[in-house]
Amino acid sequence: TRIFEAWSDEPWVNDGAAVRVSLVAFGDSQKEAVLDGATAAHIHADLTAASADGDSMDLPSAKPLLANKASCFVGTSKKASFDIPGDLARSWLALPNPHGQSNAEVVKPWINGSDLVKAPSDTWIVDFGVERPQAEAALFDAPFEYVQRVVKPEKDAVRSESERRKWWLHARTALDMRKALTGTERFMVTSIVAKHRVWVWRPTIVLASHAVCVVARADD
């Protein structure tokens, strides 16, 4: 079977829906391939076309490079209201804690897909890491009080027993990403869902959300 006709980027039929769609016709037909109204020698799975002389870049058939293995990660998935406005976060950074540690250890700038393709939202996030016990998290007074007051009621209502039990932690803490970023000063990040592929450098003090992919390399 083959794709013999396709329209790669069309508006959705319903008014008001911010959606674009691709339309594909495939089967055993031997008719000449047509992509977006133009004749093509072959239509690839990503709806790009080979030229008449067969020259093309067939990305769906590309093989992964060994050098890139274990270098790209999805950020944390919070599944609750751990995110806070930047002004509130910065006010917490100046507050003392019983154990003398700074709130900067658990209050971090946060990045999602919209921050990459639109104006930065100045959103921060409370992040108690991967396995910090509740008793240790509670020593960060203001962040923990917020999470206990705002996040815990949300976590109490979820189906996952582990998320209810560890309500002060993100649902997915992205241990693999954190390990890969250890010792680096910056990482490259891109939105998972975006019309255009944009890559941006961010310092490792920034915590990435599950809406972005993080490349754990700091070299140019």
What residue spans do the PLM features occupy?
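Catalytic nucleotidyltransferase
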Residues: 128-129, 140
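Flexible, glycine/threonine-enriched loop-and-boundary segments that flank and lead into catalytic domains
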Residues: 142, 146-213
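Short, flexible beta-strand-to-coil junctions
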Residues: 112-116, 192-196, 217-219
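Short secondary-structure capping/turn segments at boundaries of alpha-helices and beta-strands
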Residues: 96, 112-113, 176-177
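Short coil/turn segments at secondary-structure boundaries
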Residues: 37, 105-110, 121-126, 157-170
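Signature of N6-adenine DNA methyltransferases within the class I
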Residues: 1-105, 118-123, 133-138, 199-213, ...
